[in-house]
Amino acid sequence: MARGIDTKCIHLEEDEGQCSHYGALSYPIYQTATYAHPAVGQSTGFDYSRLQNPTREHLEKMVAALENGIDAFALSSGMAAISLLMELFRPGDHIIADSDLYGGSIRLFHNVNEKNGVEFSSIDCCRDGVESYVKENTKAIYIETPTNPMMNVTDIRKMADIAKRHNLILIVDNTFMSPYFQNPLDLGADVVIHSGTKYLSGHNDTLAGFIVTNREDIQEKLRFLIKTTGAGLAPFDCWLVLRGMKTLGIRMERSQENAKQIAAWLQKQKAVTRVIYPGLPDHPGHEIMKKQARGFGAMLTIQLESKEFALAILEKVRMIRFAESLGGVETLVTYPTTQTHADVPKEIRERNGITESTLRFSVGIENIEDLIGELTKVFAEIEEEKNGGKKS
């Protein structure tokens, strides 16, 4: 019988029954660059840590199991993972990419990969006729779902059908949902990307990235690339992610429950003109999420009545931190215009719906009463200042 995902976050089934070093329950950190050989032509299975390291190998097997893939690759950051994946493509290849992506991905595609001869079509994969953009040289479709930061939801099965009809690789960045809530490979994707810095590690204390695949041809190419480029994750960082993953399930559930309540509270505030959270029934992707995921996650985006109100929130929050990142135990609020999407041209940001009054929340695991209490205080202070010191 298949094991539940909470169990898979803690136990690697294939290792059970084997005696770990001294019976240690915490997987060891093999902090070594190289390995001694018993004799010429003989190896312990590890030769040099750029090629592979026992701690990294254990982590990769754990992440592959969580995403139901045949292999995973642990890299030094989420952007390192995307950069390595782009090495699968050659000059002249064409990739269809969603227009609403993390700003770092957009920067990589248009400032680095295009310079190297890869062509991109940036479209709204939720609404545009994706198939009409497929050309003779198209090799892949690249999506996030939900997207960063506008929380658009793409039908993964629909994208997988298009990819298969045209022999394309479907790549899904699953960072916002984590393997706990969504498994794109099970829905027809070929490759899954994660910024392991976010929910997988979950404590804002390390950088990591992952590529997971269920295709042997892609697995073979990626194993060669990680060996050749030297982008593998260091042993101590691997251990930090392993430790964080053990509590993935309870963190995701608590964060999601908090996000639902905060979204509902924000909907009642007159200064908030829009709350974008897939868990709300009025979200355009709500029904798709119910079909392809086991939850709605803990990311949400809001539009405020003005830039001034948005900036005032950023200045006044204290327990909620104004910081760039997501997926940790702390609740963070981010200003996409100057942070995650600062390098995206203004006209593209605005076309995607990102304005100077847009804020993105990564909801953490604090007591919900404390989170809503702080937001209530912050909103009240701003309203009072707007009214010249008079309470509204």
Question: Over which residues does each language-model region extend?
Answer:
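Positively charged, small/polar-rich N-terminal and surface patches that mediate targeting and assembly
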Residues: 2-6, 16, 54, 274, ...
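Conserved PLP-enzyme active-site core in the AAT-like
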Residues: 1, 17-18, 72-271, 276, ...
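Conserved N-terminal alpha-helix of the aminotransferase class I/II PLP-enzyme fold
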Residues: 34-83, 87-88, 104-111
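Glycine-rich beta-alpha junction loops
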Residues: 14-16, 31-37, 176, 198, ...
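N-terminal "arm"/small-domain region of PLP-dependent enzymes with the aminotransferase-like
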Residues: 1-53, 59-62
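A common structural junction motif
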Residues: 229-230, 317-327, 378-387
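PLP-dependent enzyme catalytic core of the Aspartate aminotransferase-like
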Residues: 103, 119-121, 251, 308, ...
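Conserved C-terminal alpha-helix-loop-beta "cap" of PLP-dependent enzymes
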Residues: 274-359, 363
